[in-house]
Amino acid sequence: MLLIAGAIRVSPEKVAEAREAAARMIAATRAEDGCEQYAFAEDVLDPGLIHISEVWRDQAALERHRATEHMGAWRIAMRDLAFHERNLKIYEVDEGRRL
């Protein structure tokens, strides 16, 4: 399994627009085969900072995701909304255990 975690930043005055674009992206991505988890969370103490968490079954699922129409639309939205400070990392993980 692959875990992607990190954050992106948008200017606080564009958060509402970003929320709309993110909602479309999240809904479409969660329907993809191989997507185990896909979530964005706004930082409550740092306006404009959006934390991202993704879990993918395997590299093939992630590659299919990167080629989707909604990923292309998200890239355009990120550019148009001037997202910056993109800081994401990918990790190979096992299935974990309950805490």
Stretches with model-predicted labels:
Residues 2, 41-46, 76-99:
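Glycine-rich beta-strand-turn "strand-cap" elements at beta-sheet edges
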Residues 2-40:
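N-terminal first-folded block
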Residues 2-9, 39-66:
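Short, well-ordered beta-strand segments in beta-rich or mixed alpha/beta enzyme
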Residues 11-14, 58, 94:
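Serine/threonine-rich low-complexity intrinsically disordered regions
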Residues 15, 19, 49, 68-71:
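Short, structured helix-loop boundary elements
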Residues 15-17, 61, 97-99:
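Intrinsically disordered, low-complexity acidic/polar segments
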Residues 24-36, 55-89:
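An amphipathic, aromatic/His-enriched active-site/gating alpha helix that lines ligand/cofactor pockets
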